[in-house]
Amino acid sequence: MKKKSDGQCAFLNLRLLIALLVFLSGVALAMFADARPRSGKPSSNVAQKQTVTAGVQPPNQAFWAQTNGPQGGDGIALATSPSGHIFVGTQGGGVFRSTDNGETWTGINNGLADTNVRALVINNAGHIFAGTWSSGVFRSTDNGDSWTAVNNGLDSLSVRSLVINSSGDIFAGTFYGGVYRSVDNGDNWTLLNTGAAGPYVPALAINASGDVFAATWDVKFCTGIFRSTDNGDSWTEINNGLTNLGILSFAINENGDVFAGADVDGLCGNGRVFRSTNNGDSWELVQSGLSTGNGINALLATSGGAIFAGSYGDGVFRSTDNGDNWTPVNTGLTEQRVISFTVNQNGDIFAGTYVGGGVFRSSDNGNTWVERNNGLVATDVRAIAIKSDNTIFAGTYGTGMDRSSDTGQSWEQINNGLFAHFIRSLASAPNGHIFAGADFVDGLGGVFRSTDNGQSWTDVNQGVIEFDVRALAINSNGHIFAGTYVGGTIGGVWRSTDDGESWTHVNNGDNCGLIWSLAIDSQGHIFAGTAGCGDGVYRSTDNGDTWQLANTGLTSTNVAALAVSNNGHIFAGTRSLIGKGGGIFRSSDDGETWTEEDNGLTALDVNALSINSVGHIFAGTDGGAFQSKNDGANWLDVSSGLIPPRGPIDALAIDSEGFAFAGTAGGGVFRSVQPTVRSTPAPRPRPTPRPRPTPPL
């Protein structure tokens, strides 16, 4: 064989080196391609196997995030700052701020330990003071961005009213603790009850001279109005002419005339609005044109001379002749339980409403009103149902039904035909129909059905079940069971086998009638949880025809929630009664016996239970959310991200992707940041590098 020359060898070595580099580059490219973030689109030639695992929460990440609704809330207190910003204190949702005249709202609760806000007042420096249900007074010196408790000397921490005089002295009216004063911007408080009668002070007012007016109540009777002319050091009763001592609100006009709004429960007298033109020495009834059915929770005197009265159920009334005559001004006011007012420098009037109605604004002296709740998420959500396509239905207590088709990013109110707005239960049927159970309020209640994804609703109460419907459950055959909360044999469980068209009372064996929860297992056995009668749980194995008590070991019998896991175990969430009981119980034998499973459960008043596809149990309590990954044996607090962190949860549901949704008392709906069950692709096999031809030698 002919020996190759040195040049030929060099050329051969170069070609071999090139071939090797090409081969290695192919391997490297294949490895790099496998290491890049995957787009989620499956390869055309590789089968994508899915494995279901428990969701893992990244460290230091909150478990929950608030969704964008449902919007609204109880506008308990309103105030306007010197800069024109509007603040609203809500029941359960804390404080919200609007910097654009109510067009949008932002929650500002950093440091606000109690989000049940009953009073707001702002001084000339822009410092904001919030009176809370059970945690006293909080102060913000940075426009609400942060809050600090200022309760030194304030022995009664349930604050219902706040006012500030021209010197900056702050007065706080408390719930059965009397009146307190702070002369140092809230740093310290002094009790001021000399001469005052009733210790419950729902309203305070200060005139231009610094005289303080206090509405007072006692345990057994109403005590009317007291006045202090020495900055609160002493008080004098001024009830001459008051035919109703149950005062709830005040307003003082530019002339110094004092207006007082009263309750109308009949226990404290008669009359709704009173006027004094002599600083409270005497009062006269001024209610011509006012409706007689509801009390006056709010009063407002504007710089233009108009007086506005907010009633609990009849909306807003306006007087342009100093109270002599009143006219209803409710155009656009869709919620007419009005409980607070404020007015800005431009004369725009804001009205806070109850039962979730939120805030309304009028820019034409009350002639028309527009709802302004964008970003105001402080609703009370008592029920959640999720359809198979992950459409979420949220039943609120006061504003009816909301729906979200994008995991809570946006919500729309869907109340067409839904005349009862105090929703307590929801269920989705196999045929896609949605059923809503409502409390009986204002003459409306019972069961409603939607056959078009919530676009419209129909009252389906044939068979007389217009009661408080606290629970709904639907079996695999589409039979619907409604648990009503009505004592005695008239209440209990009702069944419909025709999509709600008609109902049959199926209470054989159950004499309690106070049904709070329902669940159905894979065998079709029905479990009914009762409350208030000591019966605990009933079970039916024949589609509701007969019932038997199933309570062995169930030491707490107020059963607010029931859930069944994939392994057939039944869980009962209970609530305490007079400080006793509460907690979670498990049955692994179809309800025959129960075992208490509370290890790690630090809040024992349980309102809701939900179980994901891998058997992890979630419990909603008065003290936040808990999770068990071992069949209830141990519980972990998963309340982070809630507002407040351990606030009440009244409803729970989990969608098909494993995301948990929580209905809260004052914060709308929250969603778990991560799915509680995570579907992840199995590792893809690394592509085998395609052989490349060896260059010819």
Regions found by a protein language model. Name each.
Residues G94-R97, S135-R139, G178-R181, T223-R227, ...:
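A short loop-to-beta-strand structural motif that recurs across blades of beta-propeller domains
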Residues G69, N344, F350, V355-G357, ...:
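Blade-level signature of beta-propeller repeat domains, shared across WD40, Kelch, NHL, RCC1
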Residues N68-A79, G111-V121, G153-V163, G195-L204, ...:
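Short coil-to-beta transitions that initiate beta-strands within beta-rich domains
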Residues R36-R38, S43-P59, T676-P696:
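Ser/Thr-rich, Proline-interspersed low-complexity disordered segments
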Residues T80-S83, I122-A125, I164-S167, I206-S209, ...:
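Residue-level detector of Asp-centered blade-edge/turn motifs that repeat once per structural unit
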Residues H85-F87, F96, I128-F129, F138, ...:
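Conserved beta-propeller blade signature
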Residues T99-E103, T141-D145, V183-D187, T229-D233, ...:
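Short loop/turn segments that connect beta-strands within beta-propeller blades
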